[in-house]
Amino acid sequence: MKYGITAATGHFGQVAVKELVGLVGADNVVAIVRNLEKAKQLLPDDIEIRQGDYDDKNSLVSAFEGLDKVLFISSQPGGKISRLEQHTNVVDALKEAKVKFVAYTSFPHADQAKSALASDHTATEKLIVESGIKHSFLRNNWYLENEAGFLNGEDIVYAAGDGKVGWALEREYAEGAVKVLVSDATKDVYEFAGASRNYEDLAKAVSEVYGKEINATNVASDDYKVGLEKAGLDENTIGFILMIQDLIKQGELTEETSDLADVLGHELKALPEAIKEVIGR
């Protein structure tokens, strides 16, 4: 059986490729990338690498040719064409190439999420369902790495109230994705997440790592914005950060699920140990 991974040169993709090679062998793995030269530098020498650009459906059809299962890693917004157009190209190409199964990295509760961040994922899930391709939606919660700025041993200031997040390591999500890809018994939807924790919980874990007390202070969104402006962040970045904080405050990342641990076959890394992995300690 031939397996493909799109966007394979990204960090998530690289971890997924390594995990997949370990499970099925290099001969059965195809990495699909936009930049072949970059891929040759980042990916194992013994796997097949094919060029496939989300902006070019025909290149994707060729890249998917002969593949049985594909891990479709969602793109980042802000490209030459919209992310939804890119994703439409991918789904159309999967169907045209007669791929039998696709695992798609989606957004928490994409079928009911209110955040603007979810809209492309909601639409992509709909496209995949309508394509008739057997699928699993991997609704990844939040990477702990996204909070790297809060893991430096300084006090934490945030604007998310008591909102909780299902933090887990990016590699844990990637490893879970590959486990689903190779499974013969899959669910249509996985809500992948770690245990739900708030920023006070995060501060306690950071305190344990550094051996000193780390305080967590919740502030109003307007005050948080002022702090970000003083830190020299640009308007777009500030807007995105505030959107994430509001997303958390509204409870959209609160999740009680064991899907990720169940798929991995073991408990997720304890939060203090996961923090050490992120900061390289």
Predicted regions and their residues:
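Oxidoreductase cofactor-interface core, primarily capturing Rossmann-like NAD(P)-dependent enzymes
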Residues: K2-N28, I32-K38, D55-N58, E65, ...
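A hydrophobic C-terminal alpha-helical subdomain
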Residues: H11, D222-R281
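Short, conserved beta-strand segments within well-ordered enzyme catalytic domains
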Residues: I32, R50, L71-I73
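Rossmann-fold cofactor-recognition segment
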Residues: L43-D56
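Alpha-helix boundary/capping residues
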Residues: D46, L67, E154, V180, ...
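Short, functionally important structural connectors and interaction interfaces within domains
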Residues: D46, V157-A160, F240, E255
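N-terminal Rossmann-like NAD(P) cofactor-binding module of classical short-chain dehydrogenase/reductase
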Residues: F64, D68-L71, A103
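Membrane/wall-proximal cationic-aromatic binding patches
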Residues: N89
